[in-house]
Amino acid sequence: MEPLKHECGVAMIRLLKPLEYYKQKYGTYLYGLNKLYLLMEKQHNRGQEGAGVGCIKMHSPAGSEYVFRERALGSGAIQEIFSSINSQLANVHINEQSNEWVESYAPFIGEVYMGHLRYSTTGRSGLNYVHPFLRRNNWCSRSLMLCGNFNMTNVDEIFNSVVEKGQHPRIYSDTVIILEQLGYALDKENNRLYHEFTEKGLDGIPRALAIEDNIDLRPVLASTAPGWDGGYVICGTLGSGDMWALRDPHGIRPAFYYYDDEVVVVASERPVIQTVFNVPRRAVNELTPGSAIIVNKAGKVSVDDILGMGRNERCSFERIYFSRGSDADIYKERKALGRNLVGKILHELDYDLAHAVFSFIPNTAEVAFIGMAEGLEKHLDRYKADRIMACNAEGTLSRDMIEKIMSQKLRIEKVAIKDIKLRTFIAEGESRNDLAAHVYDVTYGIVENDVDTLVVIDDSIVRGTTLKQSIIKMLDRLHPRKIVIVSSSPQVRYPDYYGIDMSRMGEFCAFRAVVELLKEKGMENRLEEVYNRCLEQENVDDAHLENCVKAIYAPFTDDEISAKIASMLTPDDTSAEVSIVYQSLEGLHEAVPGCPGDWYFSGNYPTPGGIRLVNRAYINYYEGNVDKR
């Protein structure tokens, strides 16, 4: 129930018509900029630590800026950025200027736009880490601006490959290193064309324009991306107007695109494009894993296979939690996740629906709650039909009996309302925990004291901190006999290294529960055995890597681990019995068949880098290096 951080959200727009066209049709030169703002605001859920905007002016004369960038930190970054841009435009009185002047000189009024929303998964903060990143050059075709939703697992290898070429990256981060890698490949492509057109007799401006017109981004991407191990959507643009977005071969990170004769659009989520451009779902395409959508200077759009499509490992957590629930498929999948838990919930209730109250916390779990309620209603309908049939067979069926049977309803209530005004940052330690317990207001009078069971569904339980410090304490104030916490996702057992902020082994309540179970069962030596096996894996080649941490969980059933988690997360002064019900892996894959990536639940990582890092995470845990990721 504690919010997870996710890296990140991307948005790109390429205008395919002259700027004057948008002024005449839409009444403003800010058409592209306004659309970028909406794309970013609609994806604000994907990043609240910072944001950045980039713009390329393709017709800026020599001596004036052609690459614009604005970045800011904090949850209000989008507003800060666009306020700054609007101030700059107000200062030049854009509405009083000619088309030619706007096209040549107006800041942030260009043909290519890039937006980024940041959530850090590395612990690094500051404006230097906010996208887009920029590699400036006074040759337009060599200037490169980059942003992405990605996390690389083999940063050391990529860094070394860059340094071995003689380059000197200023910052040790995957974004900077990839920027330099792509910049090196872009320089090679420029040099190839430089020699080609020099041999054809071109020189000066004609040669520079010929290079811009003929840049081929496919070899630039194909010469660098095969060395990347991770989940990624890498977006880039050149100063000359070329633009691309490349998705990893396994489809771990999401990307969607739309284009017509006016615009090309790329974003992290489908419904965002649908809403902002008012287009039907069928018009928005998913970017094929391993492929790049490329737009050249002339505006020609192509989708090219760069890396080949690997095994489908689309991230299931995107569907459970991160992406907006307004996507048609995601909405259906989240409902299915709730329905698939009905059997376990009924078992916890001993099939007594009359004394059960159902609700959800937080709001992101509402769709799964609807599915759960539909599944329970279906069970209740079957029960009613069976009762009517039984009474009919016994000869006791009457109108009063039918009305009594049919009157049985699920008790669905809004149990908790978040108090958005309450802040806990001024307190520390126990006093902060006490304040955290009051972040939600409870609805009194809906639970029969010491009789009813309170069933509350959440989309995921990762660390369990908020559950222990706030939610269970808050629910216990309603005096239920029992509290059942339901997770629409399976137990989160393993770190993620592809863009979700959960990379420390000791953070997970499932892992902590298993460690306690091993100690209770006298099997503590297994912890050292796994540590030694992980050390051995440090020097194993990629083909023979294995996730040794799986052995930690092997001795116990899912139910045993769930019971231990419930025990650990229940505050000492809780009066009600507490149990936790998790989604099964089978239930997950049945509900979300198109996105089988489940490594944080199963330990089955999609790339060698993930396996290597999970073993390293266990080494750090065992050695007490709690701050290492």
List the predicted regions and their residue ranges.
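Hydrophobic alpha-helical segments characteristic of transmembrane helices
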Residues: L186-N191, V342-G343, L349-R382, R399, ...
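Phosphate/ATP-binding catalytic cores across multiple sugar-kinase/actin-like superfamilies
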Residues: G227-G230, E333-A354, V367, M372-G375, ...
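Extended, hydrophobic alpha-helical segments in both membrane/secreted and soluble proteins
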Residues: F358, A365-M372, L376, I412, ...
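Conserved short alpha-helical segments that host acidic/polar catalytic motifs at enzyme active sites
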Residues: M1-T288, I294-V357, I361-P362
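PRPP-dependent phosphoribosyltransferase catalytic core
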Residues: T224-A225, S240-D242, R247, Y259, ...
